[in-house]
C-alpha cells in the first residue's frame, strides 16, 4: 500500500494537448469534511482505507491542495441529449486531475466532480450538491458488487459552501475513478467540428491504451468499434437483468469502455414496470426502462456516424447489427442464472418473457421475487409468491412450466438455493434508502450513508441486523422520480 504522497501519476490524456481539454485549477469548497469513502475504490490506487482518516485527504479532494504531478484539466466533448445534438458540452463542473498508475500496472483517472466553473460550465456554478454526490457514490460502488461494470467512487467530501438549486443546499465534491473518461461525445465533438486529424488522434489514443488487442487487426478502428458494441451489449443486458434504470442515456453519458457512467436520476426497479421512468424531466419516456436497449443501439449508431472518417460504413453497420443478438444472448444467460437454471433450452426466452408479463401490473417486487424463488423448493416458493400476482391462474401456469424445468435439470435444493442466492441480491440500492441516507447526511449525520455503502458492497450475503434493508419500500418510496438537478 502507498500513502497519499506516493501516488504515481502518468497523465496520458493531458499530453494530447489543448485541443482536447483546458487547464483549470479546482475551486476549493469551504470547511471540507469526509462524508464517506470506499476502501475498495481506494485500493485501486494502492491506498489503505486509513488514508481517508488523514486531514490532508479532505483537503486534497475538497480542492484545497493538489499534487505537484497532477495536471487538472476540463475535457471538451459534445453529444446528443434526448435525441438532439448539442455541439459543445464538456466538463462543466468536473476536472480530470490526472491518471494514477497503480502497482498492478493499471491507469486510473482521478476525476473531481463539483470542482468549480470551467470554460464548459454554460451558466452553471460548477458545483455538485451533497445530495447528488451521495447518490453517485452509492451507485458507483453498488453496481460493481452486482457484477455490473461501472466507474468507481473513492469518496464524497462535504462542505459549508452554499449552492442554490430548487432550494439552498450545500456543495460537495466526489472523486470518481475510471480507466478512462472518454465518452461517445468526445468523438462526436471532433467529427461535427470537422477536426478529423484530432478525431484520428483521439481514436489512436483510445486504441493504444484501452483496446490494444485491436491494434493487430487488419482494420484496427473497425475492430475497436466492434468491441465497443460488444461491451455495451453486455452492459445493457446486466442493467435489464438487474432492473437498473439509468435515466439519462445521452451520448455524452456513454463511456467508450462500456461501463456505467454519469449517474443522475437513476433507479433500481421496485415493483416491476417495464415502462418505468426514473427521470422526472423525461416527459416522453425516451429513457424509460424498456427503452434502454433501443437507445443504447441508437447511441452506438451516433458513435458510428462519428467514426465514418476512419471506418467504412459497411463495417460499422455490420457491427451495429450484432448489438441486439449479443444483448439477447447475454440477457437470457443472466436471467437463466437468476432463475437457477443451468442448461439452455429452446423455450427459455418464452419462459422469461411470460414471467415479466405476469409481473407487469402486479405488485411484484422485482429483486425480492428472484431471491425468494430460491429460498425453498419450487412448489413451496411459488405458493408463497403467487399472492403478489393479479392473475394468479396465469402465474400458476408459468409456475408449473418453471417447476418442470427445474425438475428436468435435477439436483439438490440446497445447491439450487446456494446457486440462486449467489446471483440474486438481498440488498438493493433503492431510491428511498438513498433518500433516507441523504436526509440524515444533510443534517450532518453520515452514519446511514456509510452503513448503506458497507451493506451494498456485499449484496448477496445475509448480514445480521440488516433486515430493515430487505423490506419493500413504503408507499412514499415507491417509483420515485428523481430530478436531474445536481
Curated annotation (Swiss-Prot):
Positions contributing to ATP binding: 90, 92-93, 113, 125-126, 176, 183, 262
EC number: 2.7.7.-, 2.7.7.108
Cofactor(s) the record lists: Mg(2+); Mn(2+)
Catalysis: reaction(s): L-seryl-[protein] + ATP = 3-O-(5'-adenylyl)-L-seryl-[protein] + diphosphate; L-threonyl-[protein] + ATP = 3-O-(5'-adenylyl)-L-threonyl-[protein] + diphosphate; L-tyrosyl-[protein] + ATP = O-(5'-adenylyl)-L-tyrosyl-[protein] + diphosphate; L-histidyl-[protein] + UTP = N(tele)-(5'-uridylyl)-L-histidyl-[protein] + diphosphate
Coiled coil: none
InterPro entries assigned: SelO (IPR003846)
Gene Ontology MF terms: AMPylase activity; ATP binding; magnesium ion binding
Keywords: ATP-binding, Magnesium, Manganese, Metal-binding, Nucleotide-binding, Nucleotidyltransferase, Transferase
Binding of Mg(2+), residues: 253, 262
Transmembrane keyword on record: no
Domain of life: Bacteria
Residues of the active site: 252 (proton acceptor)
Function text: Nucleotidyltransferase involved in the post-translational modification of proteins. It can catalyze the addition of adenosine monophosphate (AMP) or uridine monophosphate (UMP) to a protein, resulting in modifications known as AMPylation and UMPylation.
Family, per entry: Belongs to the SELO family.
Protein name according to UniProt: Protein nucleotidyltransferase YdiU
Organism: Pseudomonas paraeruginosa (strain DSM 24068 / PA7)
